[in-house]
């Protein structure tokens, strides 16, 4: 008999009864969990705050109810015909259910069949036939309500509703068919459809279950509903292909319309459709394969092929012998995953999303903005529109009736709070009096010692240097306005291949003053050279694009020059502004990981605050550690250096270490808690004991920007500082949502903060309790005011954003397999700003 996968076997622990065996392919998928593990820190008793003004909000969640039963059946299905799509299989099951008058309700995910009544007799195996197709069902387990598997079954039901409504699965969501025309789109209700400039926007609805808490504290299950879109390009890879632009295609998503599957481009290779390959014991060409399998005739012999890496389940077979040693019928073993590379002709691959050039095409983005960037009042109609769409479909209504599925047709109303505004101070004056989250009209003043000299050399990667005189005049005027003692030094002009030579000259010239190179760059290649030089030599650089440097619009050019001067002196180590954050000695850490799609490398960056205002940071970056030992060594070394620097400045070690960690997916939370958090605590403990200090309080917070949750305040976006820590938060998490940035176009998306660890601190005066929710929420909001590249609040705390900027910069400019290194001269500078 086959081995039961772990997730199916866990049903027994939930009170379910496992009856049959099932391979990995049919096992319960671990990519999404409704009943998440309990990740709430052990010492936490209070998870909600109370400061700020209470506000009534709406969300894109709603209430729903579904069929209750003592237990449900889960079957593994095997079809006699190979290659049937999930949609065809579902249609087959519907016909079988009608012909055999099978009882109860059912839902199907392509392999697993869930039913509310028994569909088998005395044997756990049952066969059904229709129209020359045969399906074998094998009972795997019974499922009890309120278990993880029960909620997964309801998610399968919601996906089946999408199919009943005529949607097709593309990637992870359900959308209108890629081959649909404007005349076929449902009128008045249902998904949106838009066509323009060789682009097609396919609409759909995203639906997901989530556990929440009622105001009374009771557990509840909510349904998330939101319109979603998929952008398809009518141009195939073959049309878009150019040998010089291969790098722009690597890492992009494509769709193959013949089977509605999405892939990511790993490589592009020029091939011929008559080239042969082995499949199922046969040798055939690509042209023959697509003609036989999909009735598609390839039109061009030589063309670019998309190479994409996938994991393919491989089912092995073995012969089983009876007690007398006689071979019996072959029995299928559980499938194994095998790494494979698919070669797909470029004419069949259609690009999804936008290229960098298309993203910067203002006319294109304006045309599509009416669909992709919707206002809050439009989004509030998503839930009623979805409910009406179901009512207008007999098939979907019939399935809802069988499952007794009832969806409330109005958004869930919840309670939130608006945190008090933060005072932004520059030159001793408050500069955000008019608007708490925006101080672009405030006057920034740097606190620079008079005996400190600064020199800014200029490198123009363009032979026509006269075009940049107006910009340089604006820079010098801004220096005078800010009363900064700095002079513009030598101006060098060069070609793209000589930029390192000019930077070397700038690094060697001058003495006894802080040095900076202002570089005008024409493209990303030159920018990468400049930043790579910065990291290796320690020469600070400030880049300005050729377009901005030669802009003839005085107003726009002066805005850029003013921002450039501010960034230059922020990189020198001066603070344009500060926010008062009252904390006992604390170090705040930001961590993030950047994944380079084209090089397949991952870069991990971490920044450590080294001053009391949390404006200056020590930065580290490494190739992403591949094992536990490497991670421990890297983390320990970074913490040791940062804490040594902190001790030199203040003669003490911080009593509290607050870590904000980005780049962690939902299915990695348990691993992060067990791997990173549990590794960090003993490392810090050893450093403190070695220095004779008590172990600090450690708070570890996961920051998640990509969330589907939306919040609305009377049909508008919430004000900056709006926090929600009730009702839509998961009961076994210590989390909250915070809207920190003002959104004037489109709909604001809150950032999710999930606290994985919050320890107590043992001091001479006694035990210090974990950080109160009020304090953590206030600090988090205050840290969104300290990004020196924008005179306003940002979506995440600044340490996380700095770690993101650093990881992204290194990931894009670092070449080769050598370890990443940052010159010691700039380790304590915001050179990546």
Swiss-Prot record:
GO terms for molecular function: RNA binding. Residues 313-338 are annotated as: Disordered. Residues 320-338 have a biased composition (Basic and acidic residues). One of its GO terms (biological process) is regulatory ncRNA-mediated gene silencing. Residues 515-815 form the Piwi domain. The keyword Membrane does not apply. The keyword Ion transport does not apply. Expressed in dividing adult stem cells. Coiled coil: none annotated. Residues 227-353 form the PAZ domain. Keywords: Developmental protein, RNA-mediated gene silencing. It comes from the Eukaryota. Belongs to the argonaute family. Piwi subfamily. Required for the production of functional progeny from adult somatic stem cells (neoblasts). This is Piwi-like protein 2. The gene is wi-2.
């Amino acid at each position: 008999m086959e081995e039961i996968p772990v997730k199916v076997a866990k049903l027994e622990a939930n009170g379910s009864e496992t009856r049959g065996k099932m391979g990995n392919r049919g096992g319960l998928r671990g990519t999404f969990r409704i009943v998440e593990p309990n990740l709430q820190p052990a010492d936490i008793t209070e998870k909600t705050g109370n400061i700020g003004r209470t506000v009534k909000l709406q969300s894109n969640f709603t209430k729903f109810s579904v069929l209750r039963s003592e237990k449900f059946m889960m079957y593994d299905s095997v079809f006699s015909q190979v290659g049937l799509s999930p949609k065809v299989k579902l249609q087959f099951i519907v016909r079988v259910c009608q012909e055999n008058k099978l009882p109860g309700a059912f839902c199907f995910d392509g392999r697993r069949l869930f039913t509310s009544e028994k569909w088998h007799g005395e044997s756990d195996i049952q066969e059904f036939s229709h129209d020359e197709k045969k399906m074998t069902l094998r009972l795997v387990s019974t499922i009890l309500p309120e278990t993880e598997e029960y909620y997964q079954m309801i998610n399968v039901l919601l996906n089946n509703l999408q199919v009943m409504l005529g949607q097709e699965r593309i990637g992870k969501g359900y959308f209108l068919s890629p081959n649909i025309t404007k005349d076929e789109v449902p009128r008045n209700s249902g998904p949106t459809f838009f066509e323009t400039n060789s682009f097609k926007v396919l609409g759909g609805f995203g639906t997901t279950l989530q556990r929440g808490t009622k105001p009374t504290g009771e557990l509840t299950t909510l349904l998330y509903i939101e319109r979603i879109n998929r952008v398809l390009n009518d141009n195939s890879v073959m049309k878009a292909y150019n040998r010089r632009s291969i790098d722009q295609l690597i890492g992009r998503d494509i769709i193959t319309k013949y089977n509605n599957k999405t892939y990511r481009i790993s490589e592009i290779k020029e091939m011929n459709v008559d080239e042969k390959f082995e499949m199922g014991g046969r040798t055939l060409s690509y042209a023959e394969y697509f003609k036989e399998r999909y009735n598609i005739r390839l039109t061009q012999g030589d063309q670019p092929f998309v190479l994409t890496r996938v994991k393919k389940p491989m089912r092995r077979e073995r012969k089983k012998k009876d007690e007398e040693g006689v071979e019996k019928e072959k029995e299928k073993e559980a499938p194994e995953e095998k790494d494979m590379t698919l070669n797909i002709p470029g004419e069949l691959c259609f690009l999804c999303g936008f290229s960098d050039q298309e993203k910067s095409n203002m006319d294109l983005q304006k045309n599509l903005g009416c669909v992709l960037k919707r206002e809050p009042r439009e989004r509030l109609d998503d839930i009623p529109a979805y409910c009406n769409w179901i009512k207008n479909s007999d098939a979907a209504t019939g399935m809802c009736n069988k499952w007794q599925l009832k969806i409330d047709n109005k958004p869930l109303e919840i309670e939130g709070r608006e945190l008090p505004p933060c005072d932004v101070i520059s030159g001793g004056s408050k500069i955000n009096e008019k608007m708490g989250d925006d101080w672009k009209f405030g006057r920034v003043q740097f606190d620079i010692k008079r005996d400190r000299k600064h020199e800014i050399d200029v490198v123009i990667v363009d032979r026509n240097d006269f075009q940049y005189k107006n910009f340089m005049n604006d820079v010098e005027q801004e220096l005078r306005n800010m009363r900064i003692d700095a002079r513009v030094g030598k101006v060098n002009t060069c070609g793209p291949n000589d930029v390192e030579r000019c930077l070397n000259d700038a690094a060697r010239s001058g003495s006894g003053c802080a040095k900076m190179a202002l570089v005008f760059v024409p493209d990303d290649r030159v920018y990468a050279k400049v930043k790579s030089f910065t990291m290796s030599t320690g020469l600070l650089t400030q880049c300005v694009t050729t377009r901005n440097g030669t802009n003839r619009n005085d107003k726009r050019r002066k805005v850029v020059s003013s921002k450039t001067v501010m960034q230059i002196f922020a990189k020198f180590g001066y603070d344009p502004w500060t926010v008062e954050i009252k904390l006992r000695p604390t170090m705040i850490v930001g961590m993030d990981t950047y994944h380079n799609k084209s090089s397949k490398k991952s870069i991990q960056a971490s920044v450590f605050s080294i001053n009391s205002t949390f404006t200056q940071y020590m930065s580290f970056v490494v190739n992403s550690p591949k094992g536990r030992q490497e991670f421990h060594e890297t983390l320990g070394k970074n913490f040791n250096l940062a804490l040594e620097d902190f001790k030199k400045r203040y003669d003490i070690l911080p009593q509290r270490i607050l870590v904000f960690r980005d780049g962690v997916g939902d299915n990695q939370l348990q691993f992060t808690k067990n791997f990173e958090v549990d590794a960090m605590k003993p490392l810090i403990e050893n450093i403190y004991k070695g220095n004779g200090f008590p172990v600090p309080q450690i708070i570890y917070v996961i920051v998640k920007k990509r969330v589907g949750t939306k919040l609305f305040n009377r049909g508008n976006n919430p004000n900056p500082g709006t926090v929600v820590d009730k009702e839509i938060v998961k009961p076994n998490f210590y989390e909250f949502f915070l809207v920190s940035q003002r959104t004037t176009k489109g709909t604001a998306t809150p950032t999710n903060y999930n606290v994985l660890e919050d320890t107590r601190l043992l001091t001479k005066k006694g035990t210090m309790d974990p950080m109160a929710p009020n304090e953590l929420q206030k600090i988090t909001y205050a840290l969104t005011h300290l990004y020196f590249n924008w005179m306003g609040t940002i979506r995440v705390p600044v340490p996380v954003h700095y770690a993101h900027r650093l990881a992204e910069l290194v990931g894009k400019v670092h070449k080769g397999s050598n370890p990443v290194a940052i010159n010691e001269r700039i380790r304590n500078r915001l050179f990546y700003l």
